[in-house]
Amino acid sequence: MKFQKMGDSNTWDLVGEQQQRKKSRSPSRASRVDSELLVGVENAAELEALGLGKEQLEEEARRHKKQRSKSPALENIRKTSIHLLQKFGAIPKKKDDSVLLFRFHDIPDIPLESLCIRPKEFFEEPKVFSFRDMGREQQKAEVNEKCSYLFRGTSFDHDDHFELPTETGRVPEYDHFCPIHGSRRRLPRNKLVTMQTLMHSVDDEDNEDLAYIYGHDFLAKLVRKKKREMMSGTEKERANKIKRKIMSNLWILSVAFLFLFTAFNGLQNLQTSVNGDLGSDSLVALYLSLAISSLFVPSFMINRLGCKLTFLIAIFVYFLYIVINLRPTYSSMIPASIFCGIAASCIWGAKCAYITEMGIRYASLNFESQTTVIVRFFGYFFMIVHCGQVVGNMVSSYIFTLSYSQALRGPEDSIYDSCGYQFPKNLSDLTELAESNLARPPQKVYVAVCLAYLACVIISGMIMSMFLNALAKDARNRKMAQKFNSEIFYLMLKHLINIKFMLLVPLTIFNGLEQAFLVGVYTKAFVGCGLGIWQIGFVMACFGISDAVCSLVFGPLIKLFGRMPLFVFGAVVNLLMIVTLMVWPLNAADTQIFYVVAAMWGMADGVWNTQINGFWVALVGRQSLQFAFTKYRFWESLGIAIGFALIRHVTVEIYLLITFFMLLLGMCGFLAIENFDHIIKFWHHLIHTSCPEKEPLDDRNSDFE
């Protein structure tokens, strides 16, 4: 009979931990060993061919981490904000159960006798008397103590009367840290978070380095850098030349759109104030035709004529639209608006196709992801185009200010009873001061503004025709027989039964309603009525600056905070502005409030323009960017058309209430999409509990099936 003594082995080896428990429960990139750490094995061969070993990766990771950690204050702010958002439930907590495993060489076994000498005698120190010992003596000897086998070796399975001859027996005691029975064994529990643990991760810096080293973004940068270094001189020069041409075409396209929409946005903001009901009706026709034609016309025009010719024809239609605005009548404005809406759908569709093709070509030359490059190019494009809102409004206000004598004197410090949310449907109910502020400008001044916008459109067409390069595939498409492609229309009908798509429709329509409110209601009932038509451009320029800056900033912020905080921020800002306009007794002396409301509205509009468009891309899929942009443009244009139609039939207060409830409905739909899986599971569970499944038929009934 062989016995195992206490000093011969480690006590915890007796627990007999299974081999499966030593593996990571959720293997990640950081929980693999040696060569498996190389980005999921499929890229390991490519990295080895490029000469990127483990040492090179670690060196590059340390260098990049040193560059990233130059501002610890910003890093602490980022971590604190993420933790607060997780506490409030705005973003989900990341659960990472991975265990870092490392492969080391086995340590050779060293016999203990060569280093230590066992004592020949053991002495037991006398114990201090305690009443607890009296109770222990009365216990039965055969009572099984928890964890006793950990301290008695293999003698636990034998008789208790056997005593070791050379070693004093040890009284079994309860181990609080026993991994099986101990009360203080490691259990998954929520730990208290202090400021120190908040600023510094629980894991050490080495683990964080490993997670960064073997991240796909980091490895993609190294692979791109290595592939560029391996290119020959001729190939590198040719690739750089093509990339410079692509970037120049992108900036040329952006500047041409800047001049075009400088004219269109500036004239659009004056329609309801200068042309009255004719202006709102023409905008309804324009955006309704844009929404409908976006399903059929753009694909046919692009395939038949190519992107560049589509741009030029659309610019010519915009030119005719502005010319007709010199002498606006119902018989001329409504048809011109319909054709302008069709041209708008074509020019936006051609823009998406042109930028997408440039992004794909640039990504192949620069060894980057196509989606990353396309999104970056769209960001550059809209950064330039949104500045057109600023320039166009500044042009109109500057020309109007030179001609209006009222602009020389300041606004009166009094409450305007017929302006703001109390703006009447019948203009005859306006006060004399409000009526003078909304008086149509002299024809010469209005013609001067339109001529300035015509010059911008001509410059846009010249830039597009002389400097923009045509796509190579446009020449191939023109040789093929073209016909109307109804694929997008069929896809639109097919996705009408998709629950997720329909849940996002109310928020997209609200995006159109809030734009129509700002262009058609705020410019007339608030700014024009209180300050005068000559001030509309200045206030809308403030909106344009805020919209452009926030559209540029909110794009990268989604990577830090996620989609939910940005949507909540935009909704809260819009709700506050709507409530403010509903209770604000308009006083023209409070000039700052007009600009603050426009700036805050621009912040919210920056959220909707960037995030809703990206949300449609996420739902539809990045493989069909054209269809995603078409769906977004369709529902947004439909919302704008509905908004301009409501201006004729409801008061300002009712319009604000409709916008308020549409925003609440849209946010409910957005929250339902974000928690769609949980809602479906709850719904199935509710149906299963309320309507249990029927018992299977017996053999007699099954014969009749």
Curated annotation (Swiss-Prot):
Cellular component terms (Gene Ontology): plasma membrane; striated muscle dense body
Keyword Cytoplasm tagged: no
Tissues/organs with expression: Low levels in body-wall muscles, eight vulval muscles, intestinal muscles and a subset of head neurons.
Glycosylation sites: 426
Effect of mutating residue 562 to V: In n200; confers 'rubber band' muscle contraction
Tree of life domain: Eukaryota
Substitution effect: residue 388 to A: In e1500; confers 'rubber band' muscle contraction
Coiled-coil residues: none
Listed InterPro entries: Ion_channel_UNC-93, MFS_trans_sf, UNC-93_regulatory
Phenotypic consequence of gene deletion: Defective extension of body wall muscle connections or arms towards the ventral nerve cord. Double knockout with madd-3 results in severe muscle arm extension defects.
CDD domains named among the record's database cross-references: MFS_unc93A_like
Transmembrane region(s): 241-261, 277-297, 300-320, 325-345, 367-387, 442-462, 496-516, 520-540, 561-581, 583-603, 622-642, 648-668
Location of the protein in the cell: Cell membrane
Mode of membrane association: Multi-pass membrane protein
Assembly description: May form a complex with sup-9 and sup-10 where unc-93 and sup-10 act as regulatory subunits of the two pore potassium channel sup-9.
Family classification: Belongs to the unc-93 family.
Name the UniProt record assigns to this protein: Putative potassium channel regulatory protein unc-93
Lineage: Eukaryota, Metazoa, Ecdysozoa, Nematoda, Chromadorea
Encoding gene per record: unc-93
